[in-house]
Amino acid sequence: MNRNQILQNIEANQIKANLPNIYVGDYVKVGLLIQEGNKERVQPYEGVVIAKHNSASNSTITVRKMFQGIGVERIFLIHSPRITSIEVISNSKVRRAKLYYLRERIGKATRLKQKFSKV
């Protein structure tokens, strides 16, 4: 086995199979495992996906939320063992791959047009 095959085998073991389809503009709820002392708990983090970077086991999403009037962004490794769950709450209709322009917007200007799926 050469080096590339070994790396591919290691990455294949770390990739989670039960993830939902996540797109830029989705409103998601990420369950993050937090360790406080010797206790562990799941902390939910809700927000809009403003960026997604695909790179096999190193895929990341950037989630932005408003907390007490201040924008907070956090980058999550999708396949990290610290991520317990990712739930897509709603979808939005966007025309950009990265929604960095939301950083300058304030209040109602940060709203995105909601996308409804046909049943």
Swiss-Prot record:
A cellular component term, taken from the record's GO annotations: ribonucleoprotein complex
One of the GO BP terms on file: translation
PROSITE patterns: RIBOSOMAL_L19
InterPro entries, per database record: Ribosomal_bL19 (IPR001857), Ribosomal_bL19_CS (IPR018257), Ribosomal_bL19_sf (IPR038657), Translation_prot_SH3-like_sf (IPR008991)
Superkingdom of the source species: Eukaryota
Location within or outside the cell: Plastid, Chloroplast
Keywords of this entry: Chloroplast, Plastid, Ribonucleoprotein, Ribosomal protein
Disulfide bonds: none
Molecular function via GO: structural constituent of ribosome
Family: Belongs to the bacterial ribosomal protein bL19 family.
NCBIfam families attached to this UniProt entry: rplS_bact
Protein name as it appears in the record: Large ribosomal subunit protein bL19c
Species per Swiss-Prot/TrEMBL record: Mesostigma viride
